Amino acid sequence: MAKVVGIDLGTTNSCVAVMEGGKPTVIANAEGFRTTPSVVAYTKNGDRLVGQIAKRQAVMNPENTFYSVKRFIGRRFDEVTHEATEVSYKVLNVNGNVKLDCPALGKQFAPEEISAQVLRKLKEDASKYLGEEVTQAVITVPAYFNDSQRQATKDAGKIAGLEVLRIINEPTAASLAYGLDKKANETILVFDLGGGTFDVSILEVGDGVFEVLATSGDTHLGGDDFDKKIVDYLAESFRAQEGIDLRKDRQALQRLTEAAEKAKIELSSVMQTEINLPFITATQDGPKHLDMTLTRAKFEELCSDLIDRCRVPVEQALKDAKLSKDQIDEVVLVGGSTRIPAIQELVKRLLGKDPNQSVNPDEVVAVGAAIQAGVLAGEVKDILLLDVTPLSLGVETLGGVMTKIIPRNTTIPTKKSEVFSTAVDGQTNVEIHVLQGEREMAADNKSLGTFRLDGIPPAPRGVPQIEVTFDIDANGILNVTARDKGTGKQQSISITGASTLPKEEVERMVREAEMNAAADKAKREKIETKNQAEQLCYQAEKQLNELGDKVSTSDKDRLTSLIANLRSEIGTEAEKKPIDAIDFGRVKSLMQDLQQALYSVGSSVYQSAQSSDGTGSSSSGGSGSGGDDEVIDAEFSETK
């Protein structure tokens, strides 16, 4: 059977591995390196360069050298306006889509096409190593990649001539590599800080089972951002001295970016580094040179906000997994950016233990992808991988509240159902509004789609039973079905990639949910109280109509007055009241009064019925001849 390779398609570097003799092996490229820069360039002669050779000529050819393309893949232009200004090549808006301009060829590329060139090189190098054509692969993506980004990655594989058998999350792949030979159960935290993305996953691993307990992350945080901090520092310092902004010169920007990356790497092992860029620019007075010293302390100061941003997803993942830091057995570092001493110190401070450095952070994801490829090819047995959905899914219910059906970090595939009803009398259709997010109110969450179920027989509100079912398969495709249990009629909607969200929306939802938790809870409680008040009014009116003349005039007047007062306080259809304008203290008091009045009326009706029945039954009761309709009064006490 043909070999299936595992590929880590990274922002900065990529890597390919394969299972050989039951063990994963990283495949060196044609140049002899185990990782390949994710860089593609086109020369003025039209030649295509990929990898190290493309990276080496970037300074001389900045406008035709494409790097960090992973930040653009699967995204609309309005989602990457900030990133578009941080690269030396032109990023164009073509009908809302991202295109990369290549002046050397006089054409524009989609990001998928550039990524495909990197994948094609990895495929060719793997084919030479294995001595056979490679046509199938497992490719990794950040855990927080949305559906369009995942699909774009699959498209890149297709362009490269690969059948992508599976897209798996990078932290999950890393856990496979770490835990392949582990027999004892361990709870591990994978801290994955790469070139352009940051993921945190907590998993239970052991004896072939890899279960994701929680995942969190930031899709706009990585080594590139650390480089950018150095670039800005160098550029601002130079501008202060010379009055020239080097970032406006594409060639100078490329040189600054390379120098920043080199300085960042050096500062992981030394306390200071020299940055020398002769002839960085020129004026009428002659050439200008950049010569500066950067210390590790200054670098950490420049990047303090980025380092702090790494803290939040770790804390969120621990909270979602319902674990304390003491329950984490091992911390596995993934991605080249985890070599930064300040990052390692942060991990140690957050989790109270030294990180496990037994795996190569540049290769571990590709190794994990190769293991998953081995599972799919039948080479690796007894491996069970259980992943999760990153955000809660639900529907909008009365009062604009989001009712969650599948909580975030639920293991997929999964299927869950809830039964809902109508909100008004005689309602013949319901609109199902599918939502994703962590906020209490529907308006604050991501709308995934709406559909309508028609043909519900007219009935009093609360009578029809509408069963709403959420079904997520292993590929992350969400199907929502609404079925009227009375008639059997149903309607459904298929939402491909329920976790598809624009730039940073996932992180924003979680952050806002934390910040606004108290306010959300209070607002939800108010809406629930209002709904309960409306329901109580409806029940009271229904009871009055059903009992008719059995209710005394005084009781009827009292109930009618209480209903009117409660309706006036919460607002009616004709005169709606904003939720914040309602006095909920008075509403609760009126509800209590109305409830007591209903109990009183109910007791009176039963007493009247008993007294009228009691006249005829007392004589027959004395003779001992009990009929079928005899009612026997008995006292009983509840035992606890």
Swiss-Prot record:
Lineage: Bacteria, Bacillati, Cyanobacteriota, Cyanophyceae, Acaryochloridales
Protein name as annotated: Chaperone protein dnaK2
Cysteine disulfide links: none
CDD domains the record matches: ASKHA_NBD_HSP70_DnaK-like (cd10234)
Alphabetical list of NCBIfam families matching this protein: PRK00290.1, PRK05183.1, prok_dnaK
Phosphothreonine: modified positions: T197
InterPro entries the record matches: ATPase_NBD, Chaperone_DnaK, Heat_shock_70_CS, HSP70_C_sf, HSP70_peptide-bd_sf, Hsp_70_fam
Protein family: Belongs to the heat shock protein 70 family.
Gene Ontology molecular-function annotations: ATP binding; ATP-dependent protein folding chaperone; unfolded protein binding
Alphabetized UniProt keyword annotations: ATP-binding, Chaperone, Nucleotide-binding, Phosphoprotein, Stress response
Pfam families associated with the record: HSP70
Domain of life of the native organism: Bacteria
Region entry Disordered, spans: 605-640
Induction context: By stress conditions e.g. heat shock.
Role description: Acts as a chaperone.
Biased composition (Acidic residues): 627-640
